[in-house]
Amino acid sequence: MEFPLYTTTLLCGVISSTLLLLLLNKLTTWEHIVPSKVPWIDRRSEPFGYLRAKCRSFFNMKENITEAYYAFNKEGRAAALAIAFGRPQIILPPKYIRWIIDQPESVLSIDPIHNEFHAFVRDGLVGDHLVQEVLRRELAGHLAHLTREMNEEIADSVESVLGVSKEWATVPLRDSMRIIIARISNRLFVGKELCRNEDYIRNAVGLGMAVMPQTLVQDLLPQLLKGPLSFATKLFTRITLAGLSGHLSPVVRQRIQDVQTAEKDQLPLELLTWMAQRALQRGESATSIEEKLIARIAMANLASIETTTNTITKCMEDMTALSNETGGYLELMRQEAHTVLEACNYSPIKADLEKLVHIENALKESLRLAVVFPGLIRQVTSRTGVTLDDGTHLPHGARISVAAYAIHRDDANWTDAARYDPSRHEKASLPMSRGSEQLLSFGLGKRACPGRFFVTDELKLLFAHILTKYEFKVIKPPVTKVGLLKELTMRGPQEQLVIRRVK
């Protein structure tokens, strides 16, 4: 029996497409990296099961982490999760927290994860960790000398974005906070002139929105196709970087010249200065140093803007949504802010920020409940892998973490853990910038978030200005289905901030 030509062609096409899909599925999955004895969460017996689990994880990450924690981690066992952005993660029980942070870089490291994000900005940044080094050392070490600049930018940006009207007005909460955070961050990154340039800030904010979809698409590509297809997947990032470069190039060139010729004590205390100093000390090529410094400033923006925006937004939501329970605490925060800022005539020094205890407690509590991902993520860097004390062997390239989201909500760690209660931190001796095995918002150990000291000062002072000058409440958007593209580009429905100036 003979088949018509079009039928044969169609059949061959279906078979070829099926084989191609199966091959792509094999090339893009990392299931082989998870030991067979480790159980999976939400990995079903279905065609393309791993890829489908990755897609579902974008919407049910919290539930998956909770199941891994209570069904397996609490029993001392590991569990595997498919992750929308990146390789699957093996969620280890909390008893391994100290073990994770004590391992040398030759055994476990976060650098391979950083490298993937560096590649989204510039291929030449893979393996370059100068941004983290400068944030951890120079920025943290100079914060006491930067409080004045930070305070000045907070006051100006809050007034510019939130307004001065004593009539109630409504503004988008997240977008407003994003601009304020971008301005404060860039005041310390590149100086006053650029941080108040609206087009520069628009590009700095847009970088995160351009990179997020790219992280998902690139992870689904086989390794052999990542290079050839990276041009397409990085298109929007390149457009945004071009906008940043137009503003940054002359500033970067001038700063390189200043570092080479000016006295050290005459150089501005900024991230760009310290990066230029280190780059020149390394002997970086004159043909690439400018591009690398621009890319590093972009990386600093990518690392700081969205995460800090999430924290201040979450805290303002918490204080509004639970006002019946925390109304008294909100008044304590407001009184504290008035006392501290009025005593220094709204020109605080570093020591004044240490007095904002109630505000720090509120931020710390919001950080505790804001975490939605696993924490202490590391990749096995030992070529021979590493073996846990229960005999589970983790091969080279495997990624491990702990269930930070669930740890923060475990009643065994926190009384009435699901409840937002800033007063629970009143007796805590640890500052917001330091973590514990029960509070992993900034990570823990020597590889904890390098910008945590800056973020702590920034958010405390920002909240103090808002509390002393405004009345506000947050209105949540109606519950609607949001498309994946809007989620990825952070353009879904957002909370509205109803606000008026009172001082």
Swiss-Prot record:
Positions annotated as glycosylated: 64, 324, 413
Binding positions (heme): 449
Cofactors required: heme
Gene Ontology CC entries for this record: membrane
Domain of life: Eukaryota
Membrane topology according to the record: Single-pass membrane protein
Molecular functions (GO terms): heme binding; iron ion binding; monooxygenase activity; oxidoreductase activity, acting on paired donors, with incorporation or reduction of molecular oxygen
SUPFAM superfamilies, A to Z: Cytochrome P450 (SSF48264)
GO biological process per UniProt: secondary metabolic process
Biotechnological applications: Due to their effectiveness as antifungal agents, echinocandin derivatives can be used for the treatment of human invasive candidiasis.
Pathway: Antifungal biosynthesis
Record keyword Iron present: yes
Subcellular location: Membrane
Regions crossing the membrane: 8-24
Cited Pfam families: p450
Keywords assigned: Glycoprotein, Heme, Iron, Membrane, Metal-binding, Monooxygenase, Oxidoreductase, Transmembrane, Transmembrane helix
The protein's Enzyme Commission number: 1.-.-.-
Family statement drawn from the similarity comment of this UniProt entry: Belongs to the cytochrome P450 family.
UniProt function note: Cytochrome P450 monooxygenase; part of the gene cluster that mediates the biosynthesis of echinocandin B, a fungal lipidated cyclic hexapeptide that acts as an antifungal agent. Linoleoyl-AMP, produced by the fatty-acyl-AMP ligase ecdI, is transferred to the initiation carrier domain (T0) of ecdA. The linoleoyl-S-phosphopantetheinyl-T0 is sequentially extended with L-ornithine, L-threonine, L-proline, L-homotyrosine, L-threonine, and 4R-methyl-L-proline to form the linear hexapeptide.
Protein's name according to its UniProt entry: Cytochrome P450 monooxygenase ecdH
Gene: ecdH
